[in-house]
Structures are given as structure tokens and as C-alpha cells.
Amino acid sequence: MATMTKKKLISTISQDHKIHPNHVRTVIQNFLDKMTDALVKGDRLEFRDFGVLQVVERKPKVGRNPKNAAVPIHIPARRAVKFTPGKRMKRLIETPNKHS
């Protein structure tokens, strides 16, 4: 299984659309910055057919150290990003050889 990095994404989009990689890099970085800014503010990001990104509050909990299970570890409350895939993405992942 391969990893799609930002560098590979820029290269692929640049080649597919015959756009200079620097222009693609600028647009992608701006897109990522805007997404990050929105999530930091607590906004929900919805991309139809792709999915939803939103910030959720994780409650504090007690964990265990695997090396010493007798000693509890207190994990504080925190904010985290949750991704929920859209219907189309779910369908494509469930049946990877069939594209629609």
C-alpha cells in the first residue's frame, strides 16, 4: 500500500492539468491552511461525497500503562479532529475494484 504525500499530490495534479507545480503547491497549501483555520475556530467542514471533518471534545479518562497495568494514567480532556467519510467514499472503499 502506497502513501499519497503532499508532494506526490502536487505532482499528480500538476501533470494531470498541465499546471506549474508551484501554482498547485500554493493552492493546496492555501486550501490546507483554510481548513486548519476553520477547524481551530470549531467550524465543521463538509465536502459532499468525500466526508466531514469536525472538532470533537474527548472526555478525560483513565488509561493503563501496558508495562505496569497497576498504575493508572490520567488522560486529560482534549479536542480532536474527527473524520466521517461520505457515502461515495465509503462505497468506493468497500468495493475498491469498482469505480463509479
UniProtKB/Swiss-Prot annotation:
GO terms for biological process: chromosome condensation. Pfam families: Bac_DNA_binding. Keywords: DNA condensation, DNA-binding. It comes from the Bacteria. GO terms for molecular function: DNA binding; structural constituent of chromatin. The keyword 4Fe-4S does not apply. This is Probable DNA-binding protein HU. It comes from Chlamydia pneumoniae. The gene is hup.
